[in-house]
From Swiss-Prot:
ATP binds at residues 16, 174-176, 251, 257-258, 274, 278. K(+) binds at residue 44. GO terms for cellular component: cytoplasm. This is S-adenosylmethionine synthase. Keywords: ATP-binding, Cytoplasm, Magnesium, Metal-binding, Nucleotide-binding, One-carbon metabolism, Potassium, Transferase. GO terms for molecular function: ATP binding; magnesium ion binding; methionine adenosyltransferase activity. InterPro entries: ADOMET_SYNTHASE_CS, S-AdoMet_synt_C, S-AdoMet_synt_central, S-AdoMet_synt_N, S-AdoMet_synthetase, S-AdoMet_synthetase_sfam.
Length: 401
């Protein structure tokens, strides 16, 4: 296992066009789950110049049944879309929450898919699709996330907070960040490069205003990344020059195109399935959450300093096909023993789709906040981000006492 290397991760802001699409899709998921906790949703969003299009499949009691929309339902969907765009902050000529065109092409879920997923008298609820999902944790940061991604997210979160508060009125919603760290002995010792590209108000690409923008970004970086890591950093701030046209007006956005930003910044494998726009019967989402939860608790319990967990499902089948643990030669016990310990935790109730949703409480409108700045490494707060809890630590320790 390599211990000395350079590694890089990137993040994108809430105003990035793909993230606008993710947030709209998850706002729709939340809308339907607030009406029916057992709703089925697969909502894809396209955003481009003054246009938002929804497409996908749904089933929701009291909202869409037997091929018909309930009175007022489509108006509520449109309001949810516009409110989401407004919250992000888009009031530009090329993309404005109030003036954009909205097209709704959501329709009913296939009965053939539903019959494989729904529980029946003779079977438990099946997985919503086949697939492999991964979870990961590392002790590099307090949130047990890869440091490169952790810092990339925090830079953009801080910039967005300053934009919303008015502290940085020259910022516009679209932005990207990228952080390269040098590792020695598997620990980050220096940030060798920081890249920040941010949409800005007119005039901030030259002269004194450009210098003001650059100094602002460097201040944010210095408040996010420890000074000891910034001694040899090269900064690349809006390296192409002007960035006035951005967001969906600059590039079309689609749901599910930032899956590495959403997860571990390339530090861990990814099964390929996106999260946003999907209700929690879709194991692309719920199983990725449970594997993060398990990996995080393994590291927090002191059983390893790094942990990757894979799980696999078949559509319509409730029990997982496999569970795989890899502690990357950092484990204090055998990886196979950790697998056995996980399967032996009674309060989990198993790793079926329904057991996952029940244990984590996923049938709730909790998803829009996940759709920007990462699904993982966030603070568990009430119903939100329950997969970040550390309530299996004692169970895992007890298994090896």
């Amino acid at each position: 296992m390599r211990t000395d290397y350079l590694f890089t991760s990137e993040s994108v802001s809430e105003g990035h066009p793909d993230k606008v699409s993710d947030q709209i899709s998850d706002a729709i998921v939340d809308l339907f789950l607030s009406k029916d906790p057992e709703a089925r949703i697969a909502c894809e969003t396209l955003t481009t110049t003054q246009l938002v299009v929804l497409a996908g499949e749904i089933r929701c009691k009291g909202v869409y049944e037997n091929g018909e929309w309930a009175p007022g339902a489509q108006d509520e969907i449109e309001k949810t879309v516009r409110d989401t765009v407004k919250r992000i902050g888009y009031e530009q000529d090329g993309f404005h929450w109030e003036r954009l065109e909205f097209i709704n092409r959501l329709h009913g879920q296939s009965a053939h898919i539903a019959q494989g997923v729904d529980a029946a008298d003779n079977k438990d609820e099946g997985a919503g699709d086949q697939g492999i999902m991964f979870g990961y944790a590392t002790d590099e940061t307090p949130d047990l996330m890869p440091a490169t991604l952790y810092y990339s997210h925090k830079i953009l979160e801080r910039m967005a907070a300053d934009r919303h508060s008015g502290a940085a009125p020259f910022l516009e919603p679209d932005a990207k960040s990228q952080v390269t760290l040098r590792y020695e002995g598997s620990l980050p010792v220096a940030a060798t490069a920081v890249v920040v590209s941010t949409q800005h108000a007119p005039g901030y690409d030259e002269g004194g205003k450009e210098a003001e923008l650059h100094e602002y970004v460097k201040r944010v970086v210095a408040e996010v990344i420890p000074p000891v890591l910034l001694r040899e950093t090269k900064y690349y701030i809006n390296p192409t020059g002007s960035f006035e046209i951005g967001g969906p007006d600059g590039d079309a956005g689609l749901t599910g195109r930032k899956i590495i930003v959403d997860t571990y910044g390339g530090a861990a494998p990814h099964g390929g399935g996106a999260f946003s726009g999907k209700d929690p019967t879709k194991v692309d989402r719920s199983a990725a959450y449970i594997t993060r939860y398990l990996a995080k608790n393994v590291v927090a319990a002191g059983l390893a300093t790094r942990c990757t967990i894979q799980i696999a499902y078949a559509i319509g089948v409730s029990e997982p096909l496999s569970l795989y643990v890899d502690t990357h030669e950092t484990g204090t016990v055998g990886d196979d023993k950790i697998e056995q310990a996980i399967l032996g935790i009674a309060k989990l109730g198993g790793l079926t789709p329904r057991a996952i949703r029940t244990h984590l409480g996923l049938n709730k409108p909790i998803y829009r906040p996940t759709a920007a700045y990462g699904h993982f490494g966030r603070k568990a707060d009430g119903d939100f981000f329950p997969w970040e809890r550390l309530d299996l630590v004692d169970d895992l320790k007890a298994a090896f006492a």
